[in-house]
């Protein structure tokens, strides 16, 4: 039973954090495309790790990450207002590079396939 509740809480917090980032944070440094890939709330609801994927050049990524990290207080306050939980979790922003790694692997597989077709 607790597994399902944790999953529902993770999804609800993920949805709200995504809405907050895209609609409510007015930081000009948040210029790159940012997407929330996953949220992991601890069982005691004290911490919420928010995994974000940031697209853009390295400078835009760093600026966007700094903007998100400086907005964690606002994000936490909005989560507390929007999601009905006994404790509002402390938000921890983590960068998720899995999408970029997946794209890199896809490019490698595509180049291998091209090399094999050229050899035949």
From Swiss-Prot:
Q: Which PROSITE patterns match?
A: RBFA
Q: How does it assemble?
A: Monomer. Binds 30S ribosomal subunits, but not 50S ribosomal subunits or 70S ribosomes.
Q: Which family does it belong to?
A: Belongs to the RbfA family.
Q: Which GO terms describe its cellular component?
A: cytosol
Sorted alphabetically, which InterPro entries does this protein's record hold?
A: KH_dom-like_a/b (IPR015946), RbfA (IPR000238), RbfA_dom_sf (IPR023799), Ribosome-bd_factorA_CS (IPR020053)
**What gene, per UniProt, encodes this protein?**
rbfA
What GO terms describe the biological role, i.e. biological process, of this protein?
A: maturation of SSU-rRNA
- Annotated HAMAP family: RbfA
- Which PANTHER family does the annotation name? RIBOSOME-BINDING FACTOR A, CHLOROPLASTIC-RELATED
Q: Where in the cell is it found?
A: Cytoplasm
Q: Name one GO molecular function term.
A: ribosomal small subunit binding
Alphabetized, the UniProt keywords read:
Cytoplasm, Ribosome biogenesis
- What's this protein's name? Ribosome-binding factor A
Organism of origin: Clostridium botulinum (strain Okra / Type B1)
Known role:
One of several proteins that assist in the late maturation steps of the functional core of the 30S ribosomal subunit. Associates with free 30S ribosomal subunits (but not with 30S subunits that are part of 70S ribosomes or polysomes). Required for efficient processing of 16S rRNA. May interact with the 5'-terminal helix region of 16S rRNA.
